[in-house]
């Protein structure tokens, strides 16, 4: 990794980067309010001064993974030493996750507009819940589907980019619909229309975007 902590802090300001981190958290099952305090198996811990480094027996699997991005203790320690991270606070976890994305060779392709599925494939060896090009976990564990992850990523990046009070559907091949806070249209009807348009978009564009 040639980047510094300051570099990753800067990259974190990119809404698309935050959407990617949110997607990884969603795949790992830590997207809730306690994500940064979540241990393997769903339990939580309070001390964010360091990685808890506690092995949890989940029955089929045993793991010491913890935090929003389910860091293994040795992995987090290694990245912390390289970047000068002195705690396990949310910001430190975000920076460390970006460093792992970078280490897997996925950060530059992602920032450069690489296909979402290819980015997931690059990250699959780091996060078992992310799918390879074959749609399976790199480690044979439960995995999120690529379509599910892409929809979640789009929902996160769209929410971050859209102006407050306005959600616009893309106009290529579908009718454009706006929901504006000023006009207060019939929300149920608009929501139904947007669901239809979303399905049309997924069918029209997803095969060209994601390598299934």
Residue ranges and their predicted role:
Residues 1-86, 95-180, 184-189, 193-212:
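Cell-wall polysaccharide-cleaving catalytic domain and substrate-binding groove, primarily
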């Amino acid at each position: 990794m040639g980047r510094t902590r300051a570099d990753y802090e800067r990259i974190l300001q990119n809404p698309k980067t935050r959407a990617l981190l949110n997607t990884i958290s969603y795949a790992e099952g830590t997207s809730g309010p306690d994500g940064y305090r979540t241990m393997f198996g769903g339990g939580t811990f309070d001390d964010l001064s360091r990685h808890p480094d506690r092995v949890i027996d989940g029955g089929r699997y045993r793991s010491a993974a913890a935090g929003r991005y389910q860091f293994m203790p040795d992995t987090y320690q290694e990245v912390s030493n390289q970047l000068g991270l002195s705690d396990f606070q949310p910001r430190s976890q975000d920076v460390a996750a970006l460093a792992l994305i970078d280490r897997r060779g996925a950060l530059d392709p992602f920032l450069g507009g690489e296909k979402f599925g290819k980015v997931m494939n690059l990250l699959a060896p780091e996060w078992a819940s992310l799918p390879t090009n074959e749609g399976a976990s790199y480690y044979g564990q439960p995995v999120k589907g690529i379509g599910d992850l892409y929809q979640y990523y789009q929902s996160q990046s769209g929410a971050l980019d859209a102006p407050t009070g306005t959600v616009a559907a893309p106009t290529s091949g579908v009718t454009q619909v706006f929901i504006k806070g000023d006009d207060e249209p019939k929300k149920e009807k608009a929501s139904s229309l947007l669901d239809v348009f979303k399905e049309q978009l997924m069918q029209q564009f997803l095969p060209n975007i994601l390598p299934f």
